[in-house]
Design a protein with these regions (language model features):
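N-terminal hydrophobic/helix-forming segments and targeting peptides
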Residues: 1-464
Length: 464
């Protein structure tokens, strides 16, 4: 059952639509390299499309009716958007759920130090990275510094063409004999992922100044951001690849960028959501944090945020609220866990079983199950739900494929799917196939981005 190449369906009009969507996506992924930046931009786009802040409706006691659009912001790191459907909430929602955190390197709480004539920031990597991929690259610093007076300072260094970039040094090949004898996982140690931020001492330093290079960095941070060294204690600073996403390939058919996992599915979910008006079932787009580290914490999918905000929505759309209505709503809901899958790579065919692999250019892909080895830890979607989705996609003319995450016993992975499925709703993973997954620069096919957005929209509009 080989799936067709979706590019072959393109005429000039469709090609223009593909390029228009992907141009917008390239801007999004270039500008939004942290979960906070993704939420901020999502709110901007939602409000431009007529969405209201749900908290304002709650405080005012404003009832909601079919067609109303609202969003809920959770701590600046998670966002849920809703379009109220014509069916009662009790009948369930159609949910798109993606994550907006990506593998990266975080700055520690007490990070700045001087070693010989270099100033460096100590770090702790976040998520599953191949550490050796992050050395000798131009890197940028994104994040916030929260000060004791309550102000929050936004920091972005390394993105503007006039900005300096930062980096983590690697060992020269001439002295790398011992390093190269190690396995890849051990060649670069986590404690050696130290970010170089300067090498010039402060001018006219006093004779007793022991760390003049560090002092210059602190004086620059004070001048530009009005922050002190102590403010690092309440900072969230993320180290990410510097520079924008770009067209990839001589034919410009692909996109190389940081954070396709999972911002390509986050953006296509958001873009599909913003197109939906007056659905039958209430539509929901849920963009969450912390998936790469287990979905824990107040902004991860394990948080009660989602259930709480659905309860608030029910209270504003129903004459009366009960916990039973909430439970029925969740049970009757359907969800697409909008997450990427591993694309077949002809350079590494040995890790895939071709018949059940996702291919770039053949549309978005459904993963009936993820997990590892014997499907450990997976959400295994029901056959009836897959049949329902096949019909939805075929009726809408969406190019899709099905896949597993590599050969049996080769490895595996997981998503937020099982967390929502634990609420007894129908859930399946589906999204864009990705090359170089979890590398600093990942690759996706433009036609897959387009078909994924179409598939998500078809699901939200489905009447059953």
């Amino acid at each position: 059952m080989e799936r067709k190449n979706a590019w072959k369906s393109c005429d000039e009009a469709k090609l223009a639509q593909v390029n228009a969507l992907c141009t917008d996506y390239i801007k999004f992924i270039s500008d939004c390299k942290t979960e906070r930046e993704c939420v901020e931009e999502s709110i901007r786009l939602a409000e431009a499309a007529g969405y209201k802040n749900l908290n304002d409706c709650i405080e005012a006691g404003t009832p909601l009716k079919a067609g109303d659009k609202v969003y809920a912001n959770n701590m600046g790191k998670t966002i849920a958007l809703f379009v109220v459907g014509t069916e009662p909430m009790e009948k369930g929602m159609h949910i798109l759920g993606a994550h907006i955190d990506s593998p990266r390197i975080d700055v520690k709480q007490n990070p700045l130090y001087q070693d010989e004539d270099f100033a460096l920031l100590d770090t702790h990597y976040y998520g599953g990275i191949k550490k050796y991929q992050w050395v000798a690259l131009p890197l940028a610093l994104h994040g916030v510094v929260a000060k004791k007076d309550g102000t929050v300072v936004n920091v972005v260094i390394g993105e503007d063409p006039s900005d300096p970039v930062l980096g983590i040094s690697d060992l020269l090949i001439h002295l790398s004999g011992d390093q190269m004898a190690k396995t890849l996982s051990k060649a670069i140690e986590g404690e050696k992922l130290n970010l170089t931020v300067g090498s010039r001492p402060v001018m006219n330093a006093a004779d007793d100044c022991k760390e003049p290079v560090k002092e210059l960095i602190l004086s620059m941070l004070k001048e530009k951001y009005d922050i002190e060294e102590e403010d690092f204690l309440s900072a969230e600073l993320e180290i990410v690849p510097a520079g924008p996403a770009r067209d990839y390939g001589l034919d410009r058919s692909m996109i190389m960028g940081y954070g396709h996992d999972d911002r390509v599915c986050s953006y296509t979910s958001l873009a599909a959501m913003l197109k939906v008006e007056n659905p039958v079932h209430t539509s929901c787009c849920l963009l969450v944090d912390k998936e790469e580290v287990g979905s824990n914490g107040a902004t991860g999918m394990h948080s009660r945020f989602f259930e709480n905000i659905v309860a608030e929505l029910i209270a504003l759309t129903n004459a009366s609220y009960s916990d039973l209505i909430l439970r029925r709503c969740l049970k009757n809901s359907k969800m697409l866990s909008s997450d990427v899958s591993a694309a077949f790579d002809p350079n590494y065919p040995e890790v895939n079983e071709r018949k059940n692999s996702a291919f770039c250019g053949r549309g978005f892909t459904f993963n009936k199950y993820t997990g590892a080895r014997g499907k450990s830890g997976c959400n295994d979607a029901n056959a009836e739900e897959i049949a329902y989705l096949r019909k939805v996609m075929d009726d809408a003319g969406v190019f899709f494929q099905t896949s597993e995450l590599g050969k049996v016993d080769q490895g595996g992975g997981g998503t937020i799917a099982y967390i929502l499925a634990n609420l007894n709703m129908e859930v399946i993973d589906c999204g864009v196939p990705v090359l170089n997954m979890h590398a600093p620069w990942e690759v996706v096919s433009k036609i897959d981005v387009y078909e994924t957005c179409r598939g998500y929209e078809a699901f939200l509009r489905a009447e059953k």
